[in-house]
Design a protein with these regions (language model features):
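Conserved donor-binding/catalytic core segment of Leloir-type glycosyltransferases
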Residues: 1-13, 19-22, 35
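Short hydrophobic beta-strand element within catalytic cores of glycosyltransferases
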Residues: 99, 105-108
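Conserved acidic donor-binding segment of nucleotide-sugar-dependent glycosyltransferases
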Residues: 120-121, 125-132, 141-147
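A short, well-ordered alpha-helix in the C-terminal region of glycosyltransferases
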Residues: 134, 141, 148-163, 172-175
């Protein structure tokens, strides 16, 4: 199974939490691969590389730590079985919306802005933010249940194609303006 961490790599995105979780996940799921795709903030991947090295995770990590041009984004999503967003702090997530629009299931931290979009075990999977044990447990649970993974994937794709469809957004915006008069 391929796990995808996608986007700008900053401390608030929680890649360190995911890497610490990965060391426990590979014990039960040695065939898992974490694809890290995105440019490191200020070109500094040092802390993450140290975690990978100290925990012997290099065989389980595929690093594409560079800017990903728009025309290459689809390749990364096509390779992924699950997209992981272990954010520590966030106000909104374009990556979550993009993940669901590509028809991929997402595992996200339980921050309020993310919980406004998805529901645990229905349209995505949630874990306790900044908790690598919670993340590892949820990853192992997901990897053991491919049927649930597929159902959540379908539900997430349906959510994005209905609630976040441009026509629906336009209808809701029009309705909001009309309610002012």
């Amino acid at each position: 199974k391929v796990l995808l961490f996608f986007g700008m790599i900053k401390k608030v995105k929680g890649l360190d939490v995911l890497l610490h979780a990965l060391k426990d996940v590979v014990k039960e799921n040695p065939d898992v691969l974490l694809l890290i795709a995105g440019k490191a903030w200020e070109n500094d991947f040092t802390n993450y590389q140290r975690i990978i090295d100290e925990n012997n995770l290099s065989d389980y990590c595929l690093l594409h730590t560079k800017f990903i041009p728009h025309d290459e984004v689809e390749h990364y999503y096509c390779a992924a079985d699950l997209v992981v967003l272990p954010y520590k702090k966030i106000y909104q997530s374009g990556v979550l919306v993009m993940t669901l629009s590509y028809g991929k299931p997402a595992l996200v931290s339980n921050l309020p802005p993310l919980k406004e979009i998805v529901t645990d075990m229905q349209t995505a999977f949630l874990f306790e933010s900044e908790n690598s044990i919670s993340l590892a447990e949820k990853l192992n649970l997901i990897l053991l249940d491919p049927e649930k993974l597929e159902q959540v994937r379908i539900n997430g794709e349906e959510l994005i194609n209905t609630e976040y469809d441009w026509n629906e957004i336009g209808r809701q915006t029009k309705q909001a303006y009309q309610s002012l008069y």
